[in-house]
Amino acid sequence: PVCMAHPGTLPVINKQAVHHVLRVGTALGSDLADFTEFDRKNYFYPDIPKGYQISQYKYPLVSNGMLNGVAIERVHLEEDTASSSHEGSEGSLVDYNRAGVPLMELVTKPVIHTAEEAGAFARELQLLLRTLGVSDANMEKGEMRVEANISISKTDKLGTKVEVKNLNSFRSVERAIAYEVERMTKILDGGPGEIVQETRGWDEGGQKTFSQRKKESAHDYRYFPDPDLPKLKISEIPEFANDVLKATMPELPWEKRARLVREYGVKPENAE
């Protein structure tokens, strides 16, 4: 299979997945790329057996945009990795059923300040994805996952970033962020421990995060264009044209709320 990079099993770009990403970008008021390419993100971990992940680095499909008052950095397409289960003490289990499946990744700018803001953003994103019909976005089924990057500092100097991966409910998103903020605050106030750039998981039973692995920087991934996938010229694909994408937009959640308030006199809090 493609996720193993066996000879003769070349990857193919999923046209429908590209279309979904562009529709999300259109709804967000983003800048849609005319040229895009796919890159190899090189790292070693059991969830990616071929040693690299097909992703987008320099030329994402979508840049900028806004959702629920939160600025968007980019939306790109990549392949999903295997899922890992760390229950029990004898070892970990790896499930490759989803490996290689198209995955849309949306990255926000660092403008979310509280766990509650993060939860509200995730809920609005889920509603948007369902409205557009690009995903059922059921978090309990792994169709939508949140990875929270958390950093706090007592000064103007940026703090060390910690990523909590694969949060699969809005409650776990808010609780994991709140836990990390409290943990980091205690360390910065002189408590035991050290804040290092790492990937952490969320223990639902213990209601705490735990270290999984040290987090690499972008240059450590040694991105380079994937030679097995062609570059894309978006303007050469008729159904990806801006006017076509806009014409297929349904009534978006914030538009529906505004219409309920304007035409029917519904209170804004009830329209939500």
Regions found by a protein language model. Give the residues of each.
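Basic, nucleic-acid-interacting segments
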Residues: 1-249, 268
